[in-house]
Structures are given as C-alpha cells and as structure tokens.
C-alpha cells in the first residue's frame, strides 16, 4: 500500500537534514521551524556555487550562468555599500519590468541585509510615489519607463535613482557601477533569520496597496515547504527525474509578485533550475522558446 503524501513529507523531514524541523521561539511564540544551514537569503543565493557551469537565466539573446549572476550581484552589492552607503535594514526599491538586473539587484540587496522593495511596475507615477513614500526607500532601481515616471518627484522626495538599460542617468547607471566593482566578493554581513528581507505590496483591491514585510526565515520556510511537497509528490507518483536534464521554468508573471519572485526565481536556487524570462508575453514566441530551451514548467 502506497503511503499518502503527508506520511511521505514526514519521512523526508525525518531523513533529509535539509528539511529537519525543530521547535523554536520567535518573538516569544513557539513554532515548528526548518533547522538547516540556509538561514537567510544570502545563504540561499550562495548556493550558486553548487551549480558551476549551469545556466541560470536566459533573457532574449542573453545567457547567464549561476556564477555569472552571483558575480554581477556581488559587484552591485559592493556598489550599494560604497556608492550609496546602504546598510543593513535600509530599504531599496526596484521599479522595473522583468530584466536580469531585477533579479541580480534583489540578490544584492537582500544579501547585504538591506530590505528589497519590489514596486508594481504597472503603477502610474502617482501610485509609484505613494509606494515609495509608504516604504521609506531613498534609493530606487529603475528601468527607462519608471525613470520617466519617478524623476519628476525624485528631488522633492530626496531620492537617488539607479538606471538599468538606460542612457538617461549616466552617473548612476547599473552597468557603470558593475564595471567599477567587478570582481569583488559578496560582502559578509551578519543577517539573522528573523531580520526583515523584503516588502511586497498587495493589489490594493479595497484601498491603497499595503506593504507586506517578510523576514528571511519566512521566505526560506516557504521555499523549503514547496520543495518538500514537490519531492513528496514525485515519490508518491514514482517520478524519477533524469539527472542529465536540467530543471527549467519559464517566468511568465511579474517579479514584483510572489509567484514570479518566490515560486520561480528564488525557488530555483534549491535545485539549480534554469529560468527563461520573456520581454513580454507572446504565445507564439513562448511556444518556440519552450521547445528550443526544453522548458519543463511554467505558471501564470
């Protein structure tokens, strides 16, 4: 008789040290928590070293390995600290469509203990102003369109903008900053499990969008739970993955939403999954890429 999925999950947590569960007190309340070496996002993203030579991200004609991405994020992290004096607990916003720089910026921000604030890139200028004032960020990473929307009020709010894929802001240009700090290692910052990691905004369907703050532990726990459940389903259904085929997914939703950021981007670091990102959704183009890149999964 086959075990049900709950029994398999218990077996995995008892047998695999990556999913060991212990009771821990968080703010004087006892919880069941994962107890392993991946205690914060910096440690999650450092798993890139386990996937040497593996492709991590494909965007149009650009291809990045896990090593490439970590090197870019490390350079940008050093720029944040040295050029903009960003320190642990500071809030740094990202206002951009899906680009590789979005992912590498998020890695850099959270790896130095700062708080990443993904802003809805579909917002109007006034909505972006609301979000920026609400979260308290003074440094914003922007693409061309968001630069045009934010720059009219940037001086009034004392904001600094870092431009990606743009020639409008040469002083604080993402590529220029990478060139300055290229080759430097990721700064070593003491990050606690329950330090704040990110603020994601709700849709605002009944009023203004609300910022939802997540700790490093909260995000890591979510990723580990998904990983355990996926593993349990594979065992139940007797699915044996082909080790010669790299897991892969197509990112079809905005990274400012947790579906894109958590279940597609960050979850990939637990398995060395390849991510393919589209400039915009086009069914015909997506089908071609699914075939050529041998995409296994997508959601949206």
Which positions does each model-derived feature cover?
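A short helix-loop-beta submotif of the ANL/AMP-binding
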Residues: 90-91, 97-117, 121-125, 133-139, ...
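Conserved AMP-binding A3 loop
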Residues: 65-67, 197-225
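Conserved AMP-binding/adenylate-forming core of the ANL superfamily
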Residues: 33-37, 43, 53-87, 91-99, ...
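Conserved pre-ATP/AMP-binding loop-to-beta segment of ANL
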Residues: 183-201, 208, 238-248
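Adenylate-forming
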Residues: 97, 142-151, 253, 279-282, ...
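Flexible, non-catalytic linker and terminal segments flanking ANL/adenylate-forming cores
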Residues: 1-38, 60
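Conserved AMP-binding/adenylation subdomain of ANL enzymes
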Residues: 220-248, 256-297
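ANL superfamily adenylate-forming
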Residues: 145-193, 208, 220
């Amino acid at each position: 008789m086959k075990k049900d999925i709950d029994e398999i999950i218990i077996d995995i947590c008892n047998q695999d040290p990556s999913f060991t569960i212990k009771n821990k007190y968080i703010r004087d309340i006892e919880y069941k928590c994962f107890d392993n070496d991946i205690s914060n996002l910096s440690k999650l993203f450092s798993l890139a070293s386990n996937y040497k030579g593996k492709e991590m991200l494909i965007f149009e004609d650009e291809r990045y390995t896990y090593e490439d991405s970590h090197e870019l994020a490390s350079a940008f992290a050093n720029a944040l600290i040295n050029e903009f004096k960003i320190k642990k607990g500071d809030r740094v916003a990202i206002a951009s469509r899906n680009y590789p720089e979005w992912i590498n910026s998020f890695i850099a921000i959270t790896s130095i203990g700062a708080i990443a604030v993904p802003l809805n890139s579909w917002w109007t200028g006034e909505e972006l102003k609301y979000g920026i004032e609400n979260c308290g960020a003074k440094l914003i990473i922007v693409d061309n369109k968001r630069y045009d929307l934010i720059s009219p009020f940037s001086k009034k709010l004392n904001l600094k903008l870092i431009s990606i894929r743009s020639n409008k802001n040469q002083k604080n240009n993402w590529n220029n900053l990478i060139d300055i700090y290229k080759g430097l290692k990721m700064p070593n910052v003491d990050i606690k499990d329950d330090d704040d990691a990110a603020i994601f905004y709700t849709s605002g369907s009944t009023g203004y969008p609300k910022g939802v703050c997540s700790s490093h532990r909260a995000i890591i726990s979510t990723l580990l739970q998904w990983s355990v459940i996926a593993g349990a389903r594979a065992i139940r259904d007797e699915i044996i993955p082909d080790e010669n085929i790299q897991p892969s997914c197509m990112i079809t939703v905005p990274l400012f939403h947790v579906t894109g950021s958590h279940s597609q981007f960050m979850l990939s670091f637990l398995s060395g999954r390849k991510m393919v990102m589209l400039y915009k959704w086009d069914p015909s183009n997506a089908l071609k890429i699914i075939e050529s890149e041998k995409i296994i999964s997508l959601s949206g």
